[in-house]
Amino acid sequence: MFSKGFKKIVLSSIIAATTLPLFASEVNVYTHRHYATDKKLINMFTKQTGIKVNVVKGKASQLIKRLEIEGEYSPADILITVDAGRLEIAKNKGLLQSVSSKTLDSNVPAHLRDRDGMWYSLTKRARVIVYNKDRVTPDMLSTYEDLADPKWKNKIAVRSSNNIYNQSLLASMIAHNGKEESLAWAKGVVKNLARKPKGNDSDQAKAIVAGIGDIAVMNTYYIGRMSNSKDPAEQKIIKKVGVFFPNQGDRGTHVNISGAGVTKYSKNKENAIKYIEFLSSKEAQTIYAQANYEYPVLKGVEPSELVKSWGSFKEDSLPIDTLGKLNSEAVKTFDKAGWR
């Protein structure tokens, strides 16, 4: 008979032999992104590396909460979500870990990554002003700040202040203009609303085409998606809308990102870094740009023809992690302004 000690050694060897290859050949991703392009990139990565990518999809808030609950027992290796504010929330909750990667530092510009190496941008979206081409001309538009001018009374359609995209836009304005001026701006926009804030970005375009307001604020990704929608009605609507990049005479148009970070308790950290590095590569960045109407973060990769048709623009180079750092201040400002 074998001794108990020998059995333990054998059992440990069996466990190690069966688990190590598994960990060496997989990476587990919690993602808020839900696009066909992401599945294509997963398949490409697995084919190139032999590393299997397991995906759990959900809303950003749900995934962050799940990571909190799971703690050290979480199977997640990577968190991918949209908006720097959400990534900063995950960082502040202690759910991410710092990584060191020369590839990521080279591919992702400094202002588009966390200064502590906790997360990196993968794509960009510009938050632009869209306008009903039958009632507004580009020369009537200028800056985000101008949206508070009384000339736009009853003419603005916009999302709720609960929306992270609006929170990040206001956070950027607080960074540039200060708290008091940003509060005055938010109050001014509220006075100019054509209706109570509601719906998603696409709904704002639908509103101004339907005559509920003349201008709205949207992320460029939604414009691209509507332009290539399977719904002919959405294509018809977006053709009646013009795209304007604000603040070209000063700091540039506000941009936000989708990004990724390695989770604090990752069991496959090396594979996680490899996957994020792959997503920052020219091959992956080209697919993001051409198929999903997003701006690449990697220099030298061209946007799609549709995205280029909206024109080139100067983008705000504010360090993107600032949006998360000022998120709570932005939420307070919206509340004070009565922006619901």
Model-derived features with residue positions:
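Early extracytoplasmic/lumenal segment of secretory-pathway proteins
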Residues: 24-89, 340
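Extracellular/periplasmic bilobal clamshell ligand-binding domains
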Residues: 305-340
